[in-house]
Amino acid sequence: MDLLLGIVQGLTEFLPISSSGHLTLLSHLLKTDLNAYQTAVLHLGTLVSVVLFALDGIRRSLRSWRIILNLIVSTIPAGVFGVLFEKQIDQLFSSPRFLPLFFSATALILMFTRYSSSGEKRMENMSFLDALLVGIAQLFALFPGISRSGITVSSLLFMKYRSEDALQYSFLMSIPVVLGAGILGLGKGNVTILAPIFAFLSGLFALYVLSRSVRSGKIWQFSYYCLFVAILSYLAG
C-alpha cells in the first residue's frame, strides 16, 4: 500500500492531473480511509523533489526581493482559506462526489492553454496583482480534482509569462504550501516513512515530464486524461 500511495502521490503531484483527486479516488476504490492530513504527509516526499528541481528559481529569488514578496502574496490566499475551512476541505477527501466536476474543470483549464502562446514576462518583474491572481488560482487546488501545478502554470501562461518562468514560479509557490501541509499532517496519519520515499522518486520523474510538456507547449494534452478520470470517478461514485 505504501508503494502504491507513494507512486500515485509523486506522479500526480506535479503532473497537471491532481494528486489529491487521485488519492481521494484511490481511497474510495480501495475502501481505505485517507484524509487530507495523510495526503499532506505524502507531500513531504514530493517537497524534496521539487526543491531539487527549483534550485534555479530559488537562486533567482534570493537575488530578488520582489520574487520573495510576490511568493508571500501568492501563498496567502490558499493559506488563509485552508486554515478557515480546514474541516470542510477535509470532508471533500472522504467522498468522490465532486471529483467529476473538479477533474473536468482541470481538463478545461488545460485545454485552454492550447490557444495561449508563451509570453515574454519574467517573474523578476511580476506585479503584486499578478502574484495575487495566481495565488487565488492556487487556492482552488485545495479541492481534490483541481491540479495545483495545472492551474498555476496555466494561469501564468495566460498572463503571458515565459514558459520557463511559469514553471519556476509554480515550483516556488508549491514549497511553502506543501511544507506547511506536511508539517500539519505529521503524526495525524497512518502513512509510514516508505510512502514519502516512493513519492520523492516518482516526483522527480513527474517533474521531468511536466517540464518537457510545458516547454514544448503540450501541457494541454493532459486534459484528455483528466476527462477520462472525471468519467471514471463519476462511475465510481
From Swiss-Prot:
It catalyses: di-trans,octa-cis-undecaprenyl diphosphate + H2O = di-trans,octa-cis-undecaprenyl phosphate + phosphate + H(+). Its EC number is 3.6.1.27. It comes from the Bacteria. The keyword Cell wall biogenesis/degradation applies. The keyword Membrane applies. One of its GO terms (biological process) is cell wall organization. GO terms for cellular component: plasma membrane. It is a multi-pass membrane protein. InterPro entries: UppP. It is an enzyme of class 3 (hydrolase). It is found in: Cell inner membrane. Keywords: Antibiotic resistance, Cell inner membrane, Cell membrane, Cell shape, Cell wall biogenesis/degradation, Hydrolase, Membrane, Peptidoglycan synthesis, Transmembrane, Transmembrane helix. One of its GO terms (molecular function) is undecaprenyl-diphosphatase activity. The chain crosses the membrane at residues 38-58, 65-85, 92-112, 126-146, 166-186, 191-211, 217-237. Catalyzes the dephosphorylation of undecaprenyl diphosphate (UPP). Confers resistance to bacitracin. Belongs to the UppP family. Bacitracin is thought to be involved in the inhibition of peptidoglycan synthesis by sequestering undecaprenyl diphosphate, thereby reducing the pool of lipid carrier available. This is Undecaprenyl-diphosphatase. It comes from Thermotoga maritima (strain ATCC 43589 / DSM 3109 / JCM 10099 / NBRC 100826 / MSB8). The gene is uppP.
